[in-house]
């Protein structure tokens, strides 16, 4: 290995985002238990295993205690960092919560075994991140505050935009930064450019997270690492591809013997693969895993719809007996997103924009019916949108509803002033 060699950190997503992306977060703690001890011996930088939709799914669908799950994983994985996804001021929910709730959830998450808290805001609004970051920092080094940039494309979303946001993240006290490409919109060239730009501006480790929906994830991870990324998110191969992530084994093999060698053992990973392959077959048989979720769909680059959002849209249309309208809805999503100030499509904005697009199509008239959540998004209840919303549109949607945020008028995050 050369003098410039650096071991690339690998975060395994099999226990959280992989199954959230493929089977709607339905993997049970009982299904995880038999493989936990072996996962702990692989040498992963971290195991993403909690937060995101897991809390909701445990309570709503699996009849499980999410805290008991976390403690169980901690007990069986004493040597590997455990990681969670935290929605900033939305915590693990779908609306804003009070600061003391955010602080307490961070504290209890760390107390129950979390080492890395990946914090993001759907609008890339730094104000919605500061409480969670500060709470993590108060844990006296017990938790890494990793802040995620919600990546998307659109008129305002240039490398300069993301660099300025990364600087604000660093100023807020983050320990590391994650480029979170939830909708698989990154291309290899864009990844290389963005990683280089952020690394040149901010002295923090960079983790790269992208999905396989558009078929570009492996190439993006390769170019990102070559450009200076310090870590990557992957999924063990039976739970990889499609709306999930690049396969762990493939990326380990790609970097083996290079200056970016991960240090992970392919033979050990084969044992992990064998176990999850049995679960994969089980999910096919019981209908949890649909073959469509494993397909590559380059239309993701056009419609900018994350995989989980796609399955949710189809479900809504089926319930309305309008599944033949899926293409129209997918075409409507970017238009709704533009009207709403170009929010990145990630929880909760993906659900809000997607549901409104469904309403616009099935009613036959745009914005004839609006959800309360969409009204709240346009009114600023979720934070400041990346681009200004037309005041006339705001009035049409919100009526007499109080506008909470004065929307930004400059594309540079550092130049924007906000009144609440």
Regions found by a protein language model. Name each.
Residues 54-131, 150-162:
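Active-site beta->alpha loop and helix N-cap motifs at the rims of alpha/beta catalytic domains
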Residues 164, 216-227:
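Catalytic cores of alpha/beta
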Residues 408-415:
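Conserved small/polar residues in nucleotide/adenosyl-binding loops
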């Amino acid at each position: 290995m050369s003098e410039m060699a650096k071991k690339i950190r690998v975060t395994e997503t099999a226990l959280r985002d992989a199954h959230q992306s493929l089977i709607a977060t339905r993997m049970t703690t009982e299904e995880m238990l038999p493989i936990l001890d072996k996962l702990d011996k692989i040498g992963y930088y971290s195991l993403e295993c909690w937060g995101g939709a897991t809390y909701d799914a445990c309570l709503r669908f699996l009849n499980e205690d999410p805290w008991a799950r976390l403690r169980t994983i901690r007990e069986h994985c004493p040597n590997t960092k455990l990681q969670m996804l935290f929605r900033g001021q939305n915590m693990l929910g779908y609306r804003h919560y009070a600061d003391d709730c955010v602080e307490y959830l961070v504290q209890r998450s760390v107390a129950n075994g979390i080492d890395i808290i990946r914090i993001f805001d759907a609008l890339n609004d730094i104000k919605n991140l500061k409480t969670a970051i500060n709470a993590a920092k108060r844990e006296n080094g017990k938790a890494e505050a990793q802040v995620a940039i919600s990546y998307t494309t659109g008129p305002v979303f240039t490398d300069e935009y993301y660099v300025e946001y990364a600087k604000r993240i660093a100023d807020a006290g983050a320990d590391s930064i994650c480029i979170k490409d939830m909708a698989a919109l990154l291309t290899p060239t864009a990844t290389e450019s963005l990683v280089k730009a952020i690394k040149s501006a901010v002295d923090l480790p960079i983790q790269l997270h992208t999905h396989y929906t558009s078929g570009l994830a492996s190439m993006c991870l390769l170019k990102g690492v070559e450009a200076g990324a310090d870590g990557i998110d992957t999924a063990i191969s039976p739970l990889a591809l499609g709306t999930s992530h690049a396969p762990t084994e493939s990326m380990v093999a790609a970097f083996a013997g290079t200056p970016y060698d991960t240090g992970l053992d392919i033979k050990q990973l084969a044992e992990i693969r064998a176990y999850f392959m049995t679960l994969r077959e089980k999910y096919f048989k019981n209908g949890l895993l649909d073959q469509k979720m494993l397909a590559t769909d380059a239309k993701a680059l056009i419609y900018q719809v994350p995989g989980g959002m796609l399955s949710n849209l189809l479900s809504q249309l089926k319930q309305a007996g309008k599944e033949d309208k899926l293409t129209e809805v997918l075409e409507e999503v970017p238009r709704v997103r533009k009207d709403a100030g170009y929010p990145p499509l990630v929880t909760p904005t993906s659900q809000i924009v997607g549901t409104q697009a469904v309403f616009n199509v099935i009613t036959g008239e745009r914005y004839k019916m609006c959800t309360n959540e969409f009204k709240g998004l346009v009114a600023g209840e979720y934070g400041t949108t990346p681009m200004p919303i037309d005041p006339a549109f705001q009035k049409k949607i919100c009526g007499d509803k109080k506008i909470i945020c004065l929307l930004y008028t400059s594309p540079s995050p550092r130049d924007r002033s906000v009144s609440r």
